[in-house]
Amino acid sequence: MKFTKKQIERYSRQIILKKIGVIGQKKLLKSSVLIVGAGGLGSPIAIYLAALGIGKIGIIDKDNIEISNLSRQIIFSTNDIKKNKASTAIDKLRKINPDIQFKSFNKKLTKKNINQIAKNFDLIVDGSDNFRTRFLINDYCLQNKKILVSGAISKFDGHVYTFNFSKKKISLFKMLYT
């Protein structure tokens, strides 16, 4: 894979970093991330991943944007109220980086659809707001040897964990919450 002149210019600040360089940037451009939830965590994560040059970004969220979301879901604006979060976020991300692939899923993540949705992504970012979905994503990533980055915020507290199930065969995720 060769960089275009535009890509070299766009990603130059990352390429000059020793821990990223040309090889690392090529890996980013070939990678894919599914973001579950386009809310307070998912929306800024999506912005940064698009700017970083992740080659393919998917977002799944069934919710519509409400005015109460605007104080913390920074990808959305007043004009977006009542629109679907996933598809609206993708529209905004295309403006940030039109050269990468995007896919929106305007639905709830369930046991029935998780494999079809998540199978074509290297890494799953869990920004969901409920334990049922978190456990579903964890179980899927464990069974399919996917990398999971899980985060949650409650009032003024938050956490983020990375589980590399491509290397480990056990999950400590449920132990954190039971």
Which residue stretches match the model-derived regions?
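Adenine nucleotide-associated cytosolic modules
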Residues: 1-178
